[in-house]
Amino acid sequence: MAASAHGSVWGPLRLGIPGLCCRRPPLGLYARMRRLPGPEVSGRSVAAASGPGAWGTDHYCLELLRKRDYEGYLCSLLLPAESRSSVFALRAFNVELAQVKDSVSEKTIGLMRMQFWKKTVEDIYCDNPPHQPVAIELWKAVKRHNLTKRWLMKIVDEREKNLDDKAYRNIKELENYAENTQSSLLYLTLEILGIKDLHADHAASHIGKAQGIVTCLRATPYHGSRRKVFLPMDICMLHGVSQEDFLRRNQDKNVRDVIYDIASQAHLHLKHARSFHKTVPVKAFPAFLQTVSLEDFLKKIQRVDFDIFHPSLQQKNTLLPLYLYIQSWRKTY
């Protein structure tokens, strides 16, 4: 089996927390979720979201995140109150960019949308954001926290390059993509939290790379249903696996070995980020709550012996909000 052949990389499970039942964490995340308004986002309300009498641009960002990046939404709820709305805006910006690729039928249209967001970032730093909910909220975040323009532009530029429907040539190319998107998002989150620390940035770099790799793995069944495969070609070739094997949902050992190798790289990034947690300011830990969902996925895929098409991998963990709150309460990542 794939797991038994390579099992030495995987460390002990961390979500089991001995003695936790003896201490009762304060009510927090679930209460916040219940208090949030929840009407559906419609095209009509989106168009009017920044106008008078609408929910408001902040509510639009929150709803977009809740629907399109639920794990990011849950993590954002546990940030300090003064930072929450800015991170909602930042993550909503990322969602807007991420959904361009799947929402257009022609690359030219995707490039036009990316050009809109490039100009939007430029206009935000000229205090002239367009009348668009996410743009307005992002402008507020930039003004409030003096966010670095370079990180925002890196996210747009990398998403634009990724409009080509090509597999990553190697794991390094996937890591570079993750660094310029997910890690950049974390650098900006640290700025919102008021953290300027080399060790925190180092952790953000590795956690962002782990996030990018896990996202690529999780999306494999969806991409396969659209006749697309984006997994690193070098690892596929190493194990003699073709793109057609993934399109046919082949579950042979060599296919699972490909998934094992890729998942192991995410695991190593996560492990390395945690190896120097004592040197990272505690104030930075809330920015890294996504490690909970990353670890949850890596454990699940290990349990199914790296069968990327196993139905259990597509099921939401209903206990994730609780695990996130516990992680926040324990002040760790």
From Swiss-Prot:
Xref: Gene3D superfamilies: Farnesyl Diphosphate Synthase
Cellular component per GO, a single term: cytoplasm
Residue stretch of the organelle transit peptide: 1-44
UniProt keyword Ribonucleoprotein present: no
Disease per record: Mitochondrial complex I deficiency, nuclear type 17: A form of mitochondrial complex I deficiency, the most common biochemical signature of mitochondrial disorders, a group of highly heterogeneous conditions characterized by defective oxidative phosphorylation, which collectively affects 1 in 5-10000 live births. Clinical disorders have variable severity, ranging from lethal neonatal disease to adult-onset neurodegenerative disorders. Fanconi renotubular syndrome 5: A form of Fanconi renotubular syndrome, a disease due to a generalized dysfunction of the proximal kidney tubule resulting in decreased solute and water reabsorption. Patients have polydipsia and polyuria with phosphaturia, glycosuria and aminoaciduria. They may develop hypophosphatemic rickets or osteomalacia, acidosis and a tendency toward dehydration. Some eventually develop renal insufficiency.
Biological function: Involved in the assembly of mitochondrial NADH:ubiquinone oxidoreductase complex (complex I) at early stages. May play a role in the biogenesis of complex I subunit MT-ND1.
Name this protein carries in UniProt: NADH dehydrogenase (ubiquinone) complex I, assembly factor 6
Gene name for this UniProt entry: NDUFAF6
